[in-house]
Amino acid sequence: MNEKIAILSAYSFVNIEEPANLIPKLLLLGKRKYIRGTILLANEGFNGSFSGSYENVNLVLEELIKLTGPKDVNVKINYSDVHPFQKLKVRLKKEIIAMNVDDLNVDLFKGEYIEPKDWDEFITKQDVIVIDTRNDYEVEVGTFKSAINPNTKTFKQFPAWVQQNQELLKGKKIAMVCTGGIRCEKSTSLLKSIGYNEVYHLKGGILQYLEDTQNKNNLWQGECFVFDDRRAVTDDLSPVERHWLQR
């Protein structure tokens, strides 16, 4: 029986002084360990999704942590019968998730986590609004029943949407959701930095929620878009078999 391919996603907002210096080391290790996927590096941290054997993806993660020294890392592992990526890329970026807001300190301004097991109860409270921080083509594939869709084409448009919808957000507990946690974490940082106090986000994102809860209350509708060759996954995280999604 062939070993399943492990797909490891990890991010951390941590200050990296010279991120470019890490690229050769990570490329060399990744290629030696037959890793495929993408790792983004910036002064604000790292964000990666890569595949290989379970042992090897964890070796790469350990090296990434050793090189950057984060206090905490958000990690998610799924499995597939095949590699969902074509090759390994390690790239230097201005931001690990591009929002185009200067001097946003995610470590200093960050919302509170809601654990997947508590999410359904939390978002059904009357004073809570849910915002899906993903792009419109992702939300179209699937989202939570009560979620507001900002209809953004890119995450860079999200700050403008916030500015235009302050009345909608005023006096509410704001719950942010995204695929794996990074966009909702940065979104809560934006809102906290401009004065919103009761800001929350789904720990581990939609993928962790589906794994932990199996969507038992049917608050999630549709499938979850993913940025690899699987294109989308169902509530049990199986790849969607039909190839209807075009970008």
UniProtKB/Swiss-Prot annotation:
InterPro entries hit by this protein: Rhodanese-like_dom, Rhodanese-like_dom_sf, TrhO, TRHO_N
Signal peptide: none
Active-site residue numbers: 178 (cysteine persulfide intermediate)
GO MF terms, alphabetically ordered: oxidoreductase activity, acting on paired donors, with incorporation or reduction of molecular oxygen
Pfam families recorded: Rhodanese, UPF0176_N
CDD domains from the UniProt entry: RHOD_YceA (cd01518)
Catalysed conversion reaction: uridine(34) in tRNA + AH2 + O2 = 5-hydroxyuridine(34) in tRNA + A + H2O
SMART domains: RHOD
Source organism superkingdom: Bacteria
One BP annotation, GO: tRNA modification
PROSITE patterns, A to Z: RHODANESE_3 (PS50206)
Segments forming domain Rhodanese: 124-218
EC number: 1.14.-.-
The keyword Protein biosynthesis appears for this protein: no
The protein's role, per its UniProt record: Catalyzes oxygen-dependent 5-hydroxyuridine (ho5U) modification at position 34 in tRNAs.
Record PANTHER family: RHODANESE-LIKE DOMAIN-CONTAINING PROTEIN 7-RELATED, THIOSULFATE SULFURTRANSFERASE/RHODANESE-LIKE DOMAIN-CONTAINING PROTEIN 2
UniProt family annotation: Belongs to the TrhO family.
Name recorded for this polypeptide: tRNA uridine(34) hydroxylase
Record organism: Rickettsia rickettsii (strain Sheila Smith)
